[in-house]
Amino acid sequence: MTTTRRLSLAYLALTAGVAVLFALNLFWGSVSLTPGAVAAALLGRGEDVLAVGIVLQLRLPRAVMVVLLGAALSAAGYLLQTFFANPIAGPFVMGVSSGAKLAVALTMVVFLQQGLLTGSATLIIAAFAGSMAAMAFVLVVARRVPRMSILVICGIMIGYICSAVTDIVVTFAQDSNIVNLHNWSMGSFSGMTWANVGAAACVVLPALAAAFLLSKPMAAYQMGESYAKSVGVPVRAFSTALVLLSSLLAACVTAFAGPISFVGIAVPHLVKNLLGSAKPLYVLPGCCLGGAAFCLLCDLIARSLFAPTELSISSVTAVFGAPVVIWLLVRRQTQEGRE
């Protein structure tokens, strides 16, 4: 099979997967709806007020948000893997998501205890500040630690520290307005509104576009810093852009849905295997589609498996994502043993 044909079929499969899973997310849930009822609601012809409300105000904005944030999380993972040259680097593993989680939790508690509301912009700014703080610590450690495995362990430890402090904050937050804080801290797409969708789109879409524009220098950077410099890539500025974009994308996800594990690690590798190519120009769009499809599937399971009880999204992503990480580690160790 030629490369072009394989890429075309892979993109077609990913796009079809997103479309099918998006539709299923509108049909299934604690209240199942027929395709006709969903279509009528989308076309403005629905006569069942309850069905129209469920589709247009609950499931549709949630599904759109899952697509946006799934794409953002997968792309963030790919950018971090490129920056650290490590296949298991990701927002959750490197502590970036946990830093954002802590900052958002503190912001929500402080604002709500003062009787103030937290808008989307406030949450995104807080999450970005937290993610950058965690990333800064990881970068400081990276200068002192030559082995990437130790750096990953440090990132995991940062995540544990931030998660522990967040759990303490959530435990002692005695305010009736922050009932959903615990669910958010576990990872959840519930409660998404069209205002949330608009705010997330204003951050995610430009960031993804900027990442795509960096595809060519990214390919050179993956060959090594020396090679990148030899072909004219401003390595320092490029590295800074990778850090900022990955942190911003991960922060936006955490601000709205809480920390979501393993998506940023697993999806880029699954996409590269599906595409049969490691070129960023091909992998980045594939990551966006793959991340959207993966999160749509996991959210559908989280909502429907034990309906009306909803599982945390991280619980489901971990079930599917963790085996991929184990497979990566085993394959890498096997390859090193052969060499």
Residue spans for each PLM region:
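Alpha-helical transmembrane segments in inner-membrane proteins
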Residues: 1-339
